[in-house]
Amino acid sequence: MSFAVGQRWISDTESELGLGTVVQIEGRMVTLLFPATGENRMFAMAEAPLTRVIYNPGDTIDSAEGWGMTVDKVEELNGLVFYLGKRTDTGEDTMLRETLLEHNIRFNKPQDRLYAGQIDRIERFGVRYKAQLLRHKQATSPLLGLQGPRVGLIPHQLWIAHEVGRRHAPRVLLADEVGLGKTIEAGLIIHQQLMTGRAERVLVIVPDTLRHQWLVEMLRRFNLRFSVFDEDRCVEAFADHDNPFYTEQLVICSLELLRKKRRLEQALDADWDLMVVDEAHHLEWSEDEPSRAYQVVEALAEVVPGVLLLTATPDQLGHQSHFARLRLLDPDRFYDYQAFLDEEKGYQAVAEAADALASGIKLSDEAINGLTELLSEKDIAPAIRQIQAENLDEELRQAARDELLQELLDRHGTGRVLFRNSRASVKGFPKREFHSHGFELPEQYVTAMRVNAMMGGARTQEARVAQALSPERIYQEFDDNNASWWKFDPRVDWLIDFLKSHRSKKVLVIASRAETALALEEALRTREGIQATVFHEGMSIIERDKAGAYFAQEEGGAQALICSEIGSEGRNFQFASQLVLFDLPLNPDLLEQRIGRLDRIGQRHDVQIHLPFLKHTAQEQLMHWYHEGLCAFELTCPGGHVLFGEFKERLLSVLTGESDELDELMADTKARYKALKAAMEQGRDKLLELNSHGGAKAEAITASLSDADEDTDLIASVIRLWDVIGIDQDDKGENSIVLRTTEHMMYPTYPGLNEDGVTVTFDRNTALSRDDIALITLEHPLVQTGLDLITGSDTGTTCVALLKNKALPAGTIFLELIYLAETTAPKASQLYRYLPPTPVRVLLDKNGNNLSDKVDYDSFDKQLSGVNRHIASKLVNASQTMLHPLFAKGEEFAGEALETLTQDARARMESQLGAELSRLEALKAVNPSIREEELEHLRNMMQELSGYLGNTQLKLDAIRLVLVSHN
C-alpha cells in the first residue's frame, strides 16, 4: 500500500464512517479523517484494513459541493487521482480532485462495493442467491396463495379457492353445507387475492356474534391481521382520517354498523377491492320490499369489484331468496325472478345430462340425443364413442366424460357464480353417535325454581326458557355462594366419573355461559384433581391459544377443555372425538356449531356426543325435539334454521310449561323435517356439485401442495436464512422450533418476532393440532420478512472465495455473476406469473467463457471456502485489471439469457390468456353469466403485459470472485 495526503480510502471494518481522507503520514503510521462523522483513525500502514476508492470511466460521482459528474477519464498525479468528465447539472466539462469527493458515500452497486472492499461472508452470498431463487419459485407457483394458510389439505376447499381466487374481481356465492368449510374457502380466496395483488383492500361483513370468530380465523389460519370496526372504533379513527375505513386495509364489521347512513356512505367511498358477506342467507328480499340489510349489501356490491357471499345451501330458505343473492352478484344477468325461473327450466336438461355422464354407466339413447342437442355446435361423436366403447381403458373413458361435463358446466346458468358442496358429495366425514344420560332434578333446584316462579317478574318468554334450560342459574340468584351448585348437581358427578373412566381420551365440554365453564373447571380440580382448562369470551386471543395448546398437548396436557358458547366460536378440535354438552342451546344452528367443533373433515374417529340432562325439565323436552324431530345430534340439519323459525312459538310454549303439546309438536316437526330434507335432496344439482368439488383436478392440487409440504430443500433454505440473519432457533421437540431475536442479529428488528419468541413448525399436522404453533411455508410472513430483508439490502452482494483444487493452476480466477431480470409493473398486472424477478447466473473463467451450464451452483459452492475481508480486499485489488473485461463479457451472456426469458414469457402469456379469452368469447354465446368486463379485462391485460415485458432490464445483483488456492 502506498499512501499520499489527500487520498480517499474507506475502512473495511467501519464502512459506516464514510469516505476517509489521508491527513498525516508519520513513520509507519497513517492517519485518516472521516469528515462525515468528524472522527480520526490511525493505522499501521503495512496491515491497514483500508481500501482505496478509485472510480472508473462511466461512473457517476458527487462532489463535496453537491454537484455531480459523469467520469470520462481518470488521471493520477503525485499519488492523487483526478477525475475528468461532464457535470450532470450543466453539461460543462470539469475536473474533480479526489480530495473534494462527497464524504457521505454509500456503495449500492455490487461492483462499487467489491472495489471499495465492502465484501460479505461467503454464507451471505449463498443466502442471497437462494433467497432470489425462492422468491422466483414462489412467484411462478401455480398454487400461489394456497400453501401458506394453516388449513388441512381438503380437495374441494382448495379447488374452490384455486378456481375463484385467480379470477379478476371474483363475484361468487359459496353455499357449501355446514361443516364443509365456507369460512376457510373464503379465507383462502382472500389470501390468494392479497398475495397475487388482485386485491389490497378487503371488507368482511358478518353478524355481530361472528366478528371475533372471523378475526381469530383470519389471523390464526391465514396470518391476516384484520381490524374489527364498531362505532367506537370509527369515532376513534376520525382523528386520523375523515373516513375511518381508510385507516385500515383489512376490515371486519357488522351489518348493524353499516345500517347507519353515515357509516354506509363512508364504506361506499372507501375503495374496497373485495367484499365478503357471511350468513348472506339472512338478507331478506322481495321485489316490492327488500330489507334494509339487503339494501346495504346491494349498495356496496354495486361499487366493490369483487364480492363473495357465504350462505346456507341455496334453496334452504326458498328459491326467491336464492335468486336475490345471485342478483347481488350480477344484477344485469339476474334481473327478473320470473325470467330466472324460465331459464332454470331450460337448463334442467343440462343437469339431467350431467347426471347421466356422472353415473359412470353407458349412456342411453335418450341421454345421447340430449347431449347432442345441448352441445350442437360441437362434434361430440368421438367422445360418445369412447364412453360407449366396450374394451377401452377406463382413464380414457373418464377423460371423455370429463370433457363433456366441462362443456355442460360452461353452459350451466350459474356454474361460474355458484359453488355448493354437500356431505353427500364429499367424503371424509365421521359418524355421530348420541348418548343421553338422565338424572333426577335435585331438591335444591326444585325449591329455587318454585321460589323463582312465585316471584314472577316481567320476563320475556325467551328469558324464562333460558332459565328453565339452566336451573343452576336460578339457584345462583338465591345462593350467596355462587359456585356451590356443582356440589350437588348430578350432571357434575356424571362428568367427573366419565372423565375418570376415559382418562386416555381428550374431552371437549361446552356450556352456554362462561360462569358455568369456570365453575366446572373448579369442580374437576378441587374434587378430583382432573386436569382441565377453560376457554371463554373473557380471555384474550393469546390466553385462548395457551388453553388450546394445553388441551392439544399429548403428554402432560389437559384431559378436558371446558368452553363457553361464545368462547368456542372459530375454534376446532378435530384431535378430540368426545363431546360433552353440559346444557343445550335453544337455537339448532348453535347446536350444530357446537358439534361442528369436532365433526369436521379431518376428524379421524366417530364423534361421541354425550348429553347429561335433568329429567322432567325443559332440558329433556328440548333434547327430544332436537333428537326425534330434527335428528340434529346424529345428522347435520341444514334446514334447522327454517324449522326453528316455523315452530319457535310452539316450542317456547312447551319449554315454559304453558303448553303440554310436546307429542304433537314432535310429530309436526318430524313430518316437516322429512319433507324439507326430501325437497333439498331432490334439488341437488349433480353437475354443480361435480364442479364444486373439482374431482381429479382438486386431487391434483392437493397432491401438489402435499409434495410442497415435504420439500426438505425449502426447510433447509429457511433454517439457513434465519441462521445467517442471526435468529435464535431452539428445538422444542414435537416438530417445533422456538424463534427468538438476538443481540447479534444482522438487522435491528425482525417484524413478526416479539420478545417472547414464536413457536413454529414445518409440519402441517402439528400446526393444525396446535393453535399456538405457526405453520412455516414459503408464504409465511416470518419467511417473507427474511427474504425481503436480505434481497432488499446489500447483504451478500459481494463475496471473495477460495477454490482448493490442485488440478488448476494457483491464482486462476473465476467470476460468478448473479443478475436479476426484472421489470416494473403494478402487482395487480399479474406480470410475475410470466416473468417475476428472475436470477440469471453467469460463471466466467479468466478467458471469459461461460461455464454456468457445465458447473451447477450447489456443487461449485460446496468446494469453496471464505476469506476474511482484509485479505479479500487485497485479492480484489490485485485482480482489478482482469475483472473489468469479464464484467462486460458477463453482461453480454446475461443479455442473451434475458432475450430468451422475455420471449418465453411473452409466448406463455399469449398462449394462456389467449386461450382463456377465446374460451370465454365462445362461451358468451351459450352462457350469459360470462361478464363482458371479464373479457375486456383480459384483452387489456394482454396489451399491458406485452408492454411491460418489452421494458425488462438486467440488474447485477451479486458478485463472487473465486481464486484457486493450493494451501
Curated annotation (Swiss-Prot):
Q: How does it assemble?
A: Interacts with the RNAP. Has a higher affinity for the core RNAP than for the holoenzyme. Its ATPase activity is stimulated by binding to RNAP.
- Identify the InterPro entries for this entry: Helicase_ATP-bd, Helicase_C-like, Helicase_RapA, P-loop_NTPase, RapA_C, SNF2-like_sf, SNF2/RAD54-like_C, SNF2_N
The protein's role, per its UniProt record = Transcription regulator that activates transcription by stimulating RNA polymerase (RNAP) recycling in case of stress conditions such as supercoiled DNA or high salt concentrations. Probably acts by releasing the RNAP, when it is trapped or immobilized on tightly supercoiled DNA. Does not activate transcription on linear DNA. Probably not involved in DNA repair.
Give the EC class as a word.
hydrolase
Where on this chain does ATP bind?
Answer: D176, E177, V178, G179, L180, G181, K182, T183
Q: What keywords would UniProt list here?
A: Activator, ATP-binding, DNA-binding, Helicase, Hydrolase, Nucleotide-binding, Transcription, Transcription regulation
- The protein here is known as RNA polymerase-associated protein RapA
Species of origin reads Shewanella amazonensis (strain ATCC BAA-1098 / SB2B)
What family is reported? Belongs to the SNF2/RAD54 helicase family. RapA subfamily.
For the motif DEAH box, give the residue ranges.
278-281
Q: Which GO terms describe its biological process?
A: regulation of DNA-templated transcription
Helicase ATP-binding domain spans which residues? 163-332
EC annotation from Swiss-Prot or TrEMBL? 3.6.4.-
The record, for Pfam families, names:
Helicase_C (PF00271), RapA_C (PF12137), SNF2-rel_dom (PF00176), Tudor_1_RapA (PF18339), Tudor_RapA (PF18337)
Domain Helicase C-terminal intervals: 491-639
Top-level taxon in the UniProt lineage: Bacteria
> Which Gene3D superfamilies does its entry note?
2.30.30.140, 2.30.30.930, 3.30.360.80, 6.10.140.1500, 6.10.140.2230, P-loop containing nucleotide triphosphate hydrolases, Tandem AAA-ATPase domain
Report the PROSITE patterns cross-referenced here.
Answer: HELICASE_ATP_BIND_1, HELICASE_CTER
The organism that produces this protein has a lineage beginning with: Bacteria, Pseudomonadati, Pseudomonadota, Gammaproteobacteria, Alteromonadales
Query: Which residue ranges does UniProt annotate as crossing the membrane?
Result: none
